[in-house]
C-alpha cells in the first residue's frame, strides 16, 4: 500500500488537530507527517499515532518532498503559501475560503464529488461548513429524485 508524505498547515489549531485525528482514525497510510504552524507554535509537539511529533514553522522551504498539504490556516496565509506548495508538486487541500470562488479550483465534498480529486488538481477547496451540511441533504434528495435547479 502506498504511503503518503503529508504536511498539516496550522497543525496546532483546532482544525489542524482535527485533521491529525482524522488521519489517525481513518488509518491514512502516512510515511512522513510534517506538522506546521506559526513561529509562536514552532518547537511544540503534536501527538500522532502515539508519538510526539515536533512542530515546525510554516515557511516556503518546508514544502519539499510532500504528496499533500492540508491547510487549516486563514485565507491570507493560505494565499501567501500556495505558490510554494504548488511549486513543490504537492496537492494543497485548503480549508480556508481563499480559493472557493477561483475558476479551476474544484470545490470537493468527498461524499458527493470526491472522485474529482482523483485527477490530482494542484489545489482543492472545500465549501464552507453550512454549504457542506446543506449539500449532504440535497445530494440524498437528488439521488431519490433528480433536482433540476436550486435557488438560494
Regions found by a protein language model. Give the residues of each.
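N-terminal Rossmann-like NAD(P) cofactor-binding subdomain of oxidoreductases
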Residues: 1-151
Amino acid at each position: 500500500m502506498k504511503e503518503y508524505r503529508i504536511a498539516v498547515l496550522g497543525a496546532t489549531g483546532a482544525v489542524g488537530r482535527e485533521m491529525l485525528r482524522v488521519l489517525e482514525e481513518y488509518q491514512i497510510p502516512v510515511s512522513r507527517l510534517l506538522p506546521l504552524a506559526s513561529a509562536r507554535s514552532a518547537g511544540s509537539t503534536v501527538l500522532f499515532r502515539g508519538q510526539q511529533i515536533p512542530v515546525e514553522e510554516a515557511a516556503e522551504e518546508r514544502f519539499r518532498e510532500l504528496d499533500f498539504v492540508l491547510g487549516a490556516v486563514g485565507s491570507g496565509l493560505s494565499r501567501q503559501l500556495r505558490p510554494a506548495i504548488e511549486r513543490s508538486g504537492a496537492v494543497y487541500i485548503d480549508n480556508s475560503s481563499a480559493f472557493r470562488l477561483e475558476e479551476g479550483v474544484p470545490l470537493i465534498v468527498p461524499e458527493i464529488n470526491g472522485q474529482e480529486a482523483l485527477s490530482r488538481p494542484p489545489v482543492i477547496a472545500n465549501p464552507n461548513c453550512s454549504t457542506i451540511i446543506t449539500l449532504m441533504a440535497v445530494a440524498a434528495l437528488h439521488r431519490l429524485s433528480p433536482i433540476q435547479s436550486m435557488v438560494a
